[in-house]
Amino acid sequence: MIKKIIKLLIKIFLALAIVLELLVIFNNSKRPSGSPEYIIVPGARCKNNEPMLALKYRLDAAYEYYTIHGAVKIITTGAESQGETISEAMAAKNYLVSLGVDEADVITEEHSTNTIENLEYASDIAGKDKEYLIVSNGFHMFRIDLISRYLGIKHELYSAKTPQDILVKNYLQEVASIFYLAFKIVTGKV
């Protein structure tokens, strides 16, 4: 009897994982339709104080939106990574400024260490009542949407490319991250 229950639970878990993976895959391409006041770029890994490709793609997409629409501030997020001497947010700001973004238009949030904190702390800077465009890689869109809704952030999503070398890994990892997010919400740790 116990074996049947365990098998059933495993089947339910696998079915749920497949459904979540499909949601992640089919929500990977987003373009905004409104006029946000701020762009939030969640942090990602850096190497030698420079954004790695996933973060560069996010920043390139934010820059693209900024150059076309202007009149927005960009909030870069992320604390200092292990082995780095500046924060992810500062590395991102430096990259955007090197592309031609006015330094006064980039605000850094340098304390967040995960996606939930990225969004929460960034929206605290300008206020939850503002409208945000959140720019991240395609694999991240579904979870960012869930977190933003949970935190009460008015938002739209703008998806950046995902580097090919991390594509499969990140899409699979995202399902685990969604399960973890659900666990944190249920246990009140968000």
What does each model-found stretch correspond to?
Residues 167-190:
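A transmembrane-helix-recognition feature enriched in membrane-embedded lipid enzymes
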Residues 25-172:
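A structural signal for short, hydrophobic/glycine-enriched beta-strand patches
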Residues 1-37, 184, 190:
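N-terminal membrane-anchoring alpha-helices
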